[in-house]
């Protein structure tokens, strides 16, 4: 199942802290936008669009859907696309191509970077292969996680359509979100050996179940109580679980069809591939949430309004049409944001430069 088919199915059914904390207003050098520059965001989190960042020769380095991005210890940016001419494209922060690899991941969807001692590795979720593949940074495959027959809830491999992984930086445990499949979260050890599973699909809302568990994150912001933050996309929320799969609470994001939660210092970043209604094509935007899980900025979308502590419905609000269908967001140590997009005309990622 490729991303487009997975998305149609969705519509029918409708690592340690990365980088430094977002800098407070006034604690970094101001970048004054020039006349005519496009700005997005709210409050202390306003950005200008960097024109033509990352554009490549589409004949040599094409992309299809640009799904996710991560950064390695050398400051290189890894882009995952389901274009089998080069599934992984590696940029420097100026947008220059450094290298590319990968020709065997037709359903490339989820990308996670993990540390093991002095080495780093990648986890790739492939919708079409129904696998999670661990590779080194050059693309050499280390091992594969096949469909989890050990759970007793999967009858055949095609039921397993993983969308995302997260890694516990303490013990290396891997959490796989089967967001386009049976909607379980499956926990493995660092070698890919099954530990447990929880969740499962429900068309009606349930605290313990999901309707498109598209993303998962090990949230390390509370040093004494690490937890899982999991997307429940059709229900427009993140859910918090213990590391062994017990439900804690829900954070409702009305109007926002969120992809995966991304940790950056004390903030959570998220791409919303569509808003208001899942059938509203081209209605995506980004969200930034603080340590209390309150939305503080929505680049490309309407400003967050809270009434009696309850977030009101948000929607697309972008006269410049900066985003079409954002699928992921990554913030670097300079507070700049990179946004790969799904079903957006085979466009390369967008870079946003922090203004304040």
Predicted regions and their residues:
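Surface-exposed loop and turn segments in beta-propeller and other repeat-based domains
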Residues: 51-60, 143-156, 195-208, 296-319
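N-terminal secretory signal peptides and thylakoid transit peptides that target proteins
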Residues: 1-18
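Loop/turn-rich, solvent-exposed surfaces of beta-rich toroidal or solenoidal domains
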Residues: 256-302
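Conserved beta-strand positions in repeat-built beta-propeller and related beta-rich domains
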Residues: 79-83, 122-127, 176-179, 220, ...
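Blade-level signature of beta-propeller repeat domains, shared across WD40, Kelch, NHL, RCC1
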Residues: 325-356
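Blade/loop signatures of beta-propeller domains
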Residues: 30-51
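Beta-rich, blade/repeat-based domains predominating
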Residues: 61-74, 104-120, 150-171, 203-227, ...
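Blade-loop segments of beta-propeller domains
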Residues: 86-89, 93-119, 127
């Amino acid at each position: 199942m490729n991303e487009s088919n997975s998305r149609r199915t969705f519509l029918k059914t409708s690592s340690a802290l990365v980088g430094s904390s977002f800098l407070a207003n006034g604690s970094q050098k101001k970048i004054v936008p020039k006349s005519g520059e496009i700005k997005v965001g709210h409050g202390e989190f306003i950005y200008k669009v960097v024109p033509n960042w990352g554009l490549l020769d589409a004949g040599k380095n094409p992309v299809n859907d640009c799904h996710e991005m991560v950064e390695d210890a050398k400051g290189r940016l890894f882009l995952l696309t389901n274009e089998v001419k080069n599934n992984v494209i590696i940029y420097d922060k100026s947008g220059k191509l450094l290298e590319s690899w990968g020709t065997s991941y037709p359903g490339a969807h989820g990308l996670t970077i993990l540390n093991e001692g002095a080495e780093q590795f990648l986890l790739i979720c492939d919708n079409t292969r129904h696998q999670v593949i661990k590779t080194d940074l050059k693309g050499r495959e280390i091992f594969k996680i096949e469909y989890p027959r050990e759970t007793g809830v999967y009858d055949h491999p095609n039921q397993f359509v993983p969308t995302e992984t997260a890694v516990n930086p303490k013990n290396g445990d891997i959490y796989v979100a089967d967001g386009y499949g049976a909607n379980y979260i499956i926990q493995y050890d660092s070698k890919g050996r099954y530990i447990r599973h929880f969740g499962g699909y429900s068309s009606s809302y349930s605290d313990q179940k999901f309707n498109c568990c598209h993303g998962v994150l090990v949230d390390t912001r509370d040093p004494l109580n690490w937890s899982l933050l999991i997307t429940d996309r059709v229900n427009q929320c993140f859910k918090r679980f213990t590391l062994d799969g017990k439900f804690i609470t829900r954070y409702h994001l009305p109007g926002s069809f969120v992809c995966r939660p991304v940790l950056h210092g004390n903030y959570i970043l998220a791409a919303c591939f569509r808003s208001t209604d899942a059938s509203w094509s081209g209605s995506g935007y980004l969200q930034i949430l603080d340590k209390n899980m309150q939305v503080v900025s929505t680049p490309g979308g309407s400003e967050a309004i809270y009434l009696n502590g309850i977030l009101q419905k948000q929607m697309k609000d972008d006269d410049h049409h900066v985003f079409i269908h954002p699928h992921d967001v990554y913030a670097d140590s300079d507070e700049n944001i990179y946004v790969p997009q799904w079903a957006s005309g085979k466009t390369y990622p967008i870079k946003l430069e922090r203004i304040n």
